[in-house]
């Protein structure tokens, strides 16, 4: 259900980018979509141990796939920021992509046994 809703949101987002002059706003990302992601991030965060290290992409196959999806969303966010410097972009598009990448990060951690199976970064000086 959650992923199906996000997929629908991404179609809204794509339409928003294609039609920045959409007057009636039917094909726009709206603040409620960003807020929903934030609420889900907060709920997932309550189930996870706090981090004291960076998390490397990996762990379970599902988690690794979610990490890859997160990097793709980050790239889309950077491209949207660049586009916004040249033309009109709904600021909620950029906010949504930012929150979605955090959402995918939390999902990746949950898919690694609630964060217990996270692959943590070991700094070079301590390897």
Roles of regions detected by a PLM:
Residues 1-127:
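Phosphate/pyrophosphate-binding loop motifs in nucleotide- or prenyl diphosphate-using proteins
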């Amino acid at each position: 259900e959650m992923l199906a809703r996000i997929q629908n949101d991404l179609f809204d987002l794509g339409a928003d980018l294609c039609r920045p002059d959409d007057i009636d706003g039917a094909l726009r990302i709206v603040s409620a979509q960003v807020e929903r992601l934030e609420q889900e991030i907060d709920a997932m965060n309550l189930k996870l141990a706090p981090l004291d290290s960076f998390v490397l992409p990996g762990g379970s196959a599902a988690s690794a796939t979610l990490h890859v999806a997160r990097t793709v969303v980050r790239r889309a966010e950077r491209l949207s920021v660049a586009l916004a410097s040249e033309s009109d972009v709904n600021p909620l598009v950029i906010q949504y992509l930012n929150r979605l990448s955090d959402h995918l990060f939390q999902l990746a951690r949950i898919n690694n046994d609630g964060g217990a199976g996270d692959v943590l970064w070991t700094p070079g000086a301590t390897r």
